């Protein structure tokens, strides 16, 4: 090295840079950047192999070997259930690990009749996405509506679940099938969501959303507070006893099943007097009405701004002047109190002191509204091929629970059926586990953990088994120096 | 002690040479013995490629007019390819990928008797075609979308031996917004630098939909220094797409006229232009013989 370079070295190290020794370029890498190869980066002043435990994408059947690092040590080695008899293997451990790792962006495929392709990326395909559960009954958009990010379609509104709206984002078609820009937008959104960062989405013909794993969703600029305690009918059932003495009638307004206390089984059992109330919508069974309101962003997550819109004139034969009516949403966040006048018209009044606790009780029994994100991906043939001579044995071994699959050390649910398609709660995966290649494809960790005995029985490459201590020494020596945790 | 160059075979039998940021995918056709000789020769040559470049890296990252005279053959290829364009900012690094491909393909082709050979360095391809053979290069409309939109057939009569693609979203930074600019030229180094420069010119200048960032903010050692490179491209109108392509086409035509390239394809948001001896209508699943 010439002298002037040594001077440069001292100056650059001062700025928090690290020097990579992985190849002769010996890049100085600034904090939060990668070297010229994109394989090594400066993470908090520590030279770090940027490849996660393995690359989770389908590399096509050909040329698909990827050699991961065995352990994302700094993030999760304390959590993983590793015993001395257990080997942790990444996929592709049969190649000349650890020195040889074809970068994901050069993994090549053959096209029929074409020798080679003039593109930075050759034939990478990605099979992954996220399922998003947004705890809200607010209408965020019709089912099947496109979900847009950066103006590009990245998924759609899926079928609603209990107290929540569901989004299905990503998947191979959005990542690779529509346009380059939609693929990139999809990739960026998936990576951000998996890394538990906030992402802005727009539902076509619906709401704007800001969602982040483990936090309250923001819908049209308003942060959602509570998940409803149950449908309107269920709410009536739960709180009937508390209402019995303080009001004469309660309507729990709900887009699915609106409950009416005195008609409801719960009110009847308590011997409550029929109020003569008439609701729009369709009566299903006593006290349970469908189609009363539509989902929306108005009163209590419905399309109405005034609850009186759903009432028809009271039946004069049953109703009486002075009747006390409570109308409340399923989360208790919207509540109004009325008293009938001599003409049996409901007159709005402040919530009486003895009614307020019953409304608060609904909110108290609601859970906080959260966004939860499950990453779903499939480990195809190439991912398994590096692990054993017969990939199918690995699949069977996973089915038999002899081989445990984890994602960044987090437990996964394996889908029944073919392949190794798993789902993982991104909040359980260590930060920094997810990345991308510009293909676009998402990079995520996956580990197969199996006993040595079973590993060899699988046809695993015995020679490739390395002692954990060797792996740590060889791959993470800088981490060991920097992270006191491991020297204790 | 830094890591050494790695030579390995992909499962389809192609040779993969990797060292630091360089990844080469190589395929030779011919007798098994000749292929083996060529692969050995190329792998051997590759062992020192990165070390040679690193020795002169400081100079090669300067504007080409200020670069020292190069010692290594690859560095010389880089300078020769880039100094033709002394009327605008360019460093020899703009030709590094193509120059490595040219050097390796030259070694392989002269080491034994092959029918055809290509060296693909991240999309910058150097090739040689024997009599009666052809090399088919797939054409894409984006550097990050491998869907083929056409094929280029090169025969032994072709006077071109290099194809390179550049654009926004690839590994290199660009001043422009092209999805892909593919250039066909006499060698990969020439194609490489031309693709880079044309892609730089597929541009709308300062534009609200185009976000830029200083190159050395995203890569501290970038040869582009604090020049502004594209970081994202938003929605563009049809007219804006055509205007940006016009700007690139003008640059590509000038290169064709000067004879530094044979032809180019420029792609942006589904619009494709061609410059050279072929027509765009040949593009979609068409066959452009050369």
Q: Where are the predicted features?
A:
Chain B
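N-terminal basic/disordered segments at the start of proteins
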Residues: 1-39
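Alpha/propeptide regions of enzymes that mature by internal proteolysis
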Residues: 2-5, 32-120, 186-274, 283-290
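Short acidic (Asp/Glu) and glycine-rich catalytic loops that position anionic groups and cofactors
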Residues: 20-26, 173-177, 223-229
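Short, surface-exposed beta-strand/loop "edge" segments at domain boundaries and coil↔beta transitions
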Residues: 23, 34, 144-148, 171, ...
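Glycine-rich anion/phosphate-binding loop at the beta-strand->alpha-helix junction
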Residues: 90-186, 190-193
């Amino acid at each position: 090295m010439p002298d002037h370079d040594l001077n440069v070295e001292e100056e650059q190290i001062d700025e928090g840079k690290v020097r990579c020794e992985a190849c002769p370029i010996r890049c100085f890498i600034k904090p939060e950047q990668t070297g010229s190869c994109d394989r090594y980066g400066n993470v908090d002043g520590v030279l770090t192999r940027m490849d996660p435990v393995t690359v989770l994408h389908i590399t096509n059947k050909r040329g698909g070997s990827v050699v991961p690092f065995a352990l994302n040590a700094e993030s999760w080695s304390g959590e993983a259930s590793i015993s001395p008899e257990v080997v942790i293997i990444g996929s592709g451990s049969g190649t000349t690990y650890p020195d040889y790792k074809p970068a994901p962006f050069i993994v090549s495929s053959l096209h029929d009749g074409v020798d080679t392709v003039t593109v930075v990326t050759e034939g990478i395909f990605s099979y992954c996405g996220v399922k998003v559960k947004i705890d809200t009954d607010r209408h965020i958009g019709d089912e099947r509506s496109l979900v847009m990010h950066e103006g590009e379609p990245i998924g759609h509104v899926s079928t609603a679940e209990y107290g929540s709206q569901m989004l299905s984002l990503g998947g191979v078609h959005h990542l690779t099938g529509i346009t380059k820009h939609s693929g990139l937008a999809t990739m960026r959104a998936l990576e951000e969501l998996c890394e538990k960062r906030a992402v802005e989405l727009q539902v076509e013909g619906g709401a704007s959303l800001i969602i982040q794993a483990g936090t309250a969703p923001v819908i049209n600029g308003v942060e959602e507070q509570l998940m409803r305690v149950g449908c309107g009918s269920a709410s009536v059932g739960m709180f009937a006893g508390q209402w019995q003495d303080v009001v004469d009638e309660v309507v729990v307004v709900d887009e699915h099943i609106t409950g009416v206390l005195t008609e409801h089984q719960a009110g009847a059992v308590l011997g409550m007097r029929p109020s003569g109330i008439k609701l729009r919508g369709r009566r299903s069974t006593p006290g349970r009405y469908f189609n009363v309101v539509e989902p929306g962003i108005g009163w209590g997550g419905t399309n109405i701004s005034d609850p009186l819109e759903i009432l028809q004139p009271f039946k004069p034969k049953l109703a009486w002047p002075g009747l006390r009516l409570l109308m409340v949403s399923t989360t208790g966040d919207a509540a109004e109190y009325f008293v009938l006048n001599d003409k049996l018209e409901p007159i709005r009044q402040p919530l009486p002191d003895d009614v307020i606790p019953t409304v608060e009780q609904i909110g108290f029994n609601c859970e906080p509204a959260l966004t939860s994100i499950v990453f779903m991906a499939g480990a195809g043939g190439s991912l398994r091929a590096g692990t054993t001579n017969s990939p199918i044995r690995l699949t069977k071994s996973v089915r038999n629970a002899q081989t445990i699959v984890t994602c960044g050390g987090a437990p996964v649910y394996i889908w029944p059926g073919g392949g190794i398609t798993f789902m993982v709660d991104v909040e359980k995966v260590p930060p920094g586990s997810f990345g991308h290649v510009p293909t676009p494809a998402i990079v995520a960790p996956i580990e197969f953990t199996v006993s040595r005995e079973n590993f060899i029985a699988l046809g695993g490459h015995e020679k490739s088994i390395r002692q954990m201590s060797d792996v740590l020494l060889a791959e993470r020596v800088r981490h060991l120096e920097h992270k006191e945790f491991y020297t204790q | 002690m830094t890591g050494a160059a790695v030579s390995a075979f992909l499962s389809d039998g192609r040779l993969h040479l990797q060292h630091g940021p360089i990844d080469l995918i190589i395929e030779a056709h011919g007798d098994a013995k000749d292929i083996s000789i060529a692969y050995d020769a190329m792998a051997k040559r590759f062992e020192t490629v990165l070390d040679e470049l690193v020795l002169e890296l400081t100079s090669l990252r300067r504007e080409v007019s200020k670069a020292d005279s190069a010692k290594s053959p690859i560095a010389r290829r880089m300078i020769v390819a880039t100094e033709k364009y002394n009327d605008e900012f360019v460093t020899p690094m703009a030709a590094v990928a193509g120059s490595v491909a040219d050097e390796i393909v030259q070694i392989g082709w002269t080491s034994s008797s092959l029918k055809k050979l290509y060296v693909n360095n991240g999309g910058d391809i150097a090739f040689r075609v024997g009599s009666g053979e052809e090399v088919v290069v797939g054409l894409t409309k984006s550097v990050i979308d491998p869907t083929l939109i056409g094929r280029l057939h090169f025969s032994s009569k072709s006077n071109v031996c290099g194809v390179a693609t550049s654009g926004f979203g690839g590994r290199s930074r660009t001043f422009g917004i092209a999805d892909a600019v593919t250039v066909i030229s006499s060698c990969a180094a020439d194609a490489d630098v031309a693709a880079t420069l044309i892609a730089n010119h597929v541009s709308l200048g300062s534009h609200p939909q185009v976000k830029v960032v200083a190159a050395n903010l995203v890569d501290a050692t970038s040869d582009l220094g604090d020049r502004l490179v594209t970081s994202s491209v938003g929605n563009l109108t049809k007219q804006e797409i055509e205007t940006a392509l016009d700007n690139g086409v003008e640059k590509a035509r000038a290169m064709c006229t000067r004879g530094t390239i044979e032809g180019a394809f420029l792609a942006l948001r589904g619009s494709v232009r061609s410059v050279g001896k072929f027509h765009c209508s040949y593009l979609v699943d068409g066959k452009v013989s050369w």
